[in-house]
Amino acid sequence: MSPTPAPAIVASRPILAVLVHVPDPEAAVAWYARALPGSVRHRLPEPDPVHYLDLGGVMLELVPCDEKVASGPAGSVVYWHTPDFDASFAHLVACGATPYRGPGDIEDGQRMCQLRDPWGNCIGLRGPAIDRE
Protein backbone atom coordinates (compact mmCIF):
# COMPACT_ATOMS: atom_id res chain seq x y z
CA MET A 1 0.00 0.00 0.00
CA SER A 2 1.48 3.35 -0.99
CA PRO A 3 1.43 6.19 1.51
CA THR A 4 -1.11 8.96 1.17
CA PRO A 5 0.50 11.99 -0.41
CA ALA A 6 1.13 14.85 1.99
CA PRO A 7 -0.80 18.04 1.36
CA ALA A 8 1.16 20.94 -0.07
CA ILE A 9 2.31 23.28 2.68
CA VAL A 10 4.16 25.79 0.54
CA ALA A 11 1.68 27.76 -1.52
CA SER A 12 1.92 31.01 -3.43
CA ARG A 13 2.00 32.79 -0.04
CA PRO A 14 3.77 30.38 2.27
CA ILE A 15 3.91 32.67 5.32
CA LEU A 16 0.52 33.44 6.85
CA ALA A 17 1.41 34.78 10.29
CA VAL A 18 4.34 35.50 12.56
CA LEU A 19 3.79 35.50 16.33
CA VAL A 20 5.85 37.81 18.52
CA HIS A 21 5.63 37.09 22.25
CA VAL A 22 5.56 40.19 24.44
CA PRO A 23 4.55 41.02 28.03
CA ASP A 24 2.16 43.79 26.89
CA PRO A 25 0.46 43.13 23.52
CA GLU A 26 -1.36 46.49 23.48
CA ALA A 27 1.88 48.43 23.90
CA ALA A 28 3.62 46.17 21.38
CA VAL A 29 0.99 46.57 18.65
CA ALA A 30 1.19 50.36 19.09
CA TRP A 31 4.99 50.24 18.78
CA TYR A 32 4.99 47.92 15.76
CA ALA A 33 2.29 50.01 14.03
CA ARG A 34 4.60 53.03 14.36
CA ALA A 35 7.70 51.02 13.37
CA LEU A 36 6.00 49.43 10.33
CA PRO A 37 4.16 52.25 8.56
CA GLY A 38 1.49 51.10 6.16
CA SER A 39 0.45 48.16 8.33
CA VAL A 40 -3.24 47.79 9.20
CA ARG A 41 -3.98 47.34 12.90
CA HIS A 42 -6.58 44.78 14.10
CA ARG A 43 -7.84 43.50 17.43
CA LEU A 44 -9.93 40.38 17.82
CA PRO A 45 -12.42 40.64 20.71
CA GLU A 46 -12.44 39.24 24.23
CA PRO A 47 -12.20 36.92 26.13
CA ASP A 48 -8.61 36.53 24.90
CA PRO A 49 -7.95 39.54 22.70
CA VAL A 50 -5.47 39.09 19.88
CA HIS A 51 -3.65 42.12 18.51
CA TYR A 52 -2.19 41.91 15.05
CA LEU A 53 -0.99 43.96 12.12
CA ASP A 54 -1.72 43.07 8.52
CA LEU A 55 1.44 43.59 6.48
CA GLY A 56 0.29 42.94 2.94
CA GLY A 57 -1.33 39.62 3.78
CA VAL A 58 1.14 38.46 6.45
CA MET A 59 -0.24 38.79 9.97
CA LEU A 60 2.15 40.00 12.66
CA GLU A 61 0.45 38.77 15.84
CA LEU A 62 1.51 40.31 19.17
CA VAL A 63 0.67 37.71 21.80
CA PRO A 64 1.34 37.46 25.53
CA CYS A 65 4.51 35.68 26.56
CA ASP A 66 3.97 32.94 29.14
CA GLU A 67 5.72 30.05 30.85
CA LYS A 68 6.06 28.19 27.53
CA VAL A 69 7.35 31.03 25.33
CA ALA A 70 9.17 34.00 26.79
CA SER A 71 9.84 37.34 25.16
CA GLY A 72 13.37 37.83 23.90
CA PRO A 73 15.92 37.02 21.21
CA ALA A 74 15.99 33.20 21.50
CA GLY A 75 14.82 31.12 18.58
CA SER A 76 13.99 31.99 14.99
CA VAL A 77 14.34 35.43 13.43
CA VAL A 78 12.02 36.60 10.67
CA TYR A 79 13.72 38.85 8.13
CA TRP A 80 11.65 41.63 6.61
CA HIS A 81 12.59 42.87 3.14
CA THR A 82 12.87 46.61 2.61
CA PRO A 83 13.53 48.52 -0.60
CA ASP A 84 15.84 50.94 1.29
CA PHE A 85 17.85 49.24 4.02
CA ASP A 86 19.55 52.31 5.47
CA ALA A 87 16.34 54.37 5.74
CA SER A 88 14.44 51.45 7.30
CA PHE A 89 17.26 50.74 9.76
CA ALA A 90 17.34 54.41 10.82
CA HIS A 91 13.53 54.46 11.16
CA LEU A 92 13.46 51.39 13.42
CA VAL A 93 16.24 52.81 15.61
CA ALA A 94 14.34 56.12 15.85
CA CYS A 95 11.27 54.14 16.99
CA GLY A 96 13.32 52.59 19.80
CA ALA A 97 14.72 49.37 18.30
CA THR A 98 18.26 48.51 19.39
CA PRO A 99 20.87 47.18 16.92
CA TYR A 100 21.74 43.59 17.87
CA ARG A 101 23.82 42.14 14.98
CA GLY A 102 25.19 44.09 12.07
CA PRO A 103 24.37 45.82 9.91
CA GLY A 104 26.59 44.11 7.41
CA ASP A 105 27.01 43.76 3.68
CA ILE A 106 26.01 40.45 2.08
CA GLU A 107 25.70 39.24 -1.51
CA ASP A 108 24.31 41.20 -4.46
CA GLY A 109 24.56 44.66 -2.87
CA GLN A 110 22.26 43.67 -0.04
CA ARG A 111 22.63 44.54 3.64
CA MET A 112 21.19 42.77 6.64
CA CYS A 113 20.98 43.14 10.40
CA GLN A 114 19.07 42.15 13.49
CA LEU A 115 17.53 44.66 15.84
CA ARG A 116 15.74 44.13 19.14
CA ASP A 117 12.30 45.54 19.76
CA PRO A 118 11.63 47.15 23.18
CA TRP A 119 10.78 43.68 24.59
CA GLY A 120 13.99 42.03 23.39
CA ASN A 121 12.57 40.19 20.35
CA CYS A 122 14.74 40.13 17.23
CA ILE A 123 13.66 41.83 14.03
CA GLY A 124 15.60 40.81 10.95
CA LEU A 125 15.99 43.43 8.23
CA ARG A 126 17.33 42.85 4.74
CA GLY A 127 17.46 44.95 1.61
CA PRO A 128 19.60 46.99 -0.75
CA ALA A 129 21.76 49.83 0.44
CA ILE A 130 20.82 52.93 -1.52
CA ASP A 131 23.76 55.01 -2.74
CA ARG A 132 22.92 58.58 -1.71
CA GLU A 133 26.05 60.26 -3.10
Where are the regions a protein language model picked out?
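Core segments of cupin and vicinal oxygen chelate
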Residues: 9-13, 19-60
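Active-site beta-strand termini and strand-to-loop segments that position acidic
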Residues: 53-57, 115-118, 128
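Conserved beta-strand in the GNAT
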Residues: 61-63, 114, 123-126
